[in-house]
A protein has these predicted regions:
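Ankyrin repeat A-helix N-terminal signature
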Residues: 2, 7-14, 20-21, 32-38, ...
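Ankyrin repeat domain, specifically the short helix-to-loop turn at the C-terminus of the second helix
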Residues: 43-51, 76-84, 130-138, 183-191
Length: 191
């Protein structure tokens, strides 16, 4: 093994399962607009009846696509249009997990050799987390597999991350020391 055993929050290595690379394809105009934060195009597609739940090849819906690409405005538009806040992809990532993840994903900007974080506005992401909770997001949903975004961190020898199998939004917030979100999730029934 690579140092990871069982389900939970063990550090280090990739788990024995979940090594599938992302499958390419299945992108719709709505998914592209959500990924790029093209809010005007997104609004027009929604107005014309685009399917808010049609996923790409890995099961990622437009809402999850927006959140995983830090497009908070697009995510808010999709939620307000009625997107399912409890959908998940092949890896088990939900919109709530993604919002907590990107609120707390700090990494060095190796391209510019700068110690800056990932350009996430922590303050702006909190209202979106609250909105997801108001709309009934499952605070206890668990991830199932290691997402592709973590495989490259492993390749860069940055293994200071939590084993993703079985991780909840609360565990992700706890690992980052995000007590604000931890309290919020507990108030909404997190285990």
């Amino acid at each position: 093994g690579c140092g990871s055993e069982g389900v939970g929050i063990n550090r280090g290595g990739l788990p024995d399962r979940g090594r599938r690379d992302a499958v390419k394809g299945g992108m719709t105009p709505l998914l592209y607009a959500a990924r790029e934060g093209a809010d005007a195009a997104l609004a027009e597609l929604i107005r014309r009846g685009a399917n808010l739940e049609l996923p790409e090849a890995n099961g990622m819906t437009p809402l999850l696509m927006a959140l995983l690409n830090n497009q908070l405005g697009s995510a808010r538009q999709l939620i307000e249009a009625g997107a399912n806040v409890n959908t998940d992809d092949f890896y088990g990532r939900t919109p709530l997990w993604a919002a907590v993840e990107y609120r707390n994903l700090d990494m060095n900007n190796r391209i510019e050799d700068s110690p800056t974080s990932n350009n996430v506005d922590r303050a702006a992401s909190l209202p979106l987390i609250k909105l997801l909770l108001e709309k009934g997001a499952d605070v206890n949903a668990r991830t199932r597999e290691v997402p592709p975004s973590r495989k490259w961190l492993y390749a860069l020898n940055d293994v200071s991350w939590v084993d993703f199998t079985g991780q909840t939004p609360f565990l992700r917030a706890a690992f980052a020391g995000d007590t604000t979100v931890m309290h919020l999730l507990l108030d909404h029934g997190a285990d």
